[in-house]
Amino acid sequence: MLYGDVGCGKTHMAIATGMLACERGMPVRFFTASSLVMRLRRARDENRLDAELRAIGRARLLVIDELGYLPIDIDGARLLFQAGADSYETRSVISASNPESGRWGDVFGDGDMAAAVIDRIVHHGRILRFHGESYRNKHPLMK
């Protein structure tokens, strides 16, 4: 998990890691958390959720960006949890986020589900903390 302040390079690091994995021949899938939830909802509504989860599961690296930036309703949290649970102990997952750990219940709409997600992340994972001044604030294109 890449965790920290806005603009400190979490997404940049996630993309760079994904690109390096691709260069080494690994299949990689990249989603924002909200786009992944929308994709899974659409697949479920079209009765093809299992096929979508299998397609995502073919990646050896799953990158989920912006996890926690937007609240996810309980239905979306369950779908995201399902994708994450399918990845647990079978593939590498990079997630980039910035909410404080105490806010995960708000993000997932359910404290128990948040605890289960965090439990799986910390079991085999590493949390890399990014902090400092926002790169975008330091190097604005608008002056």
Can you say where each PLM-predicted feature lies in the sequence?
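Walker A/P-loop nucleotide-binding motif
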Residues: 1-13
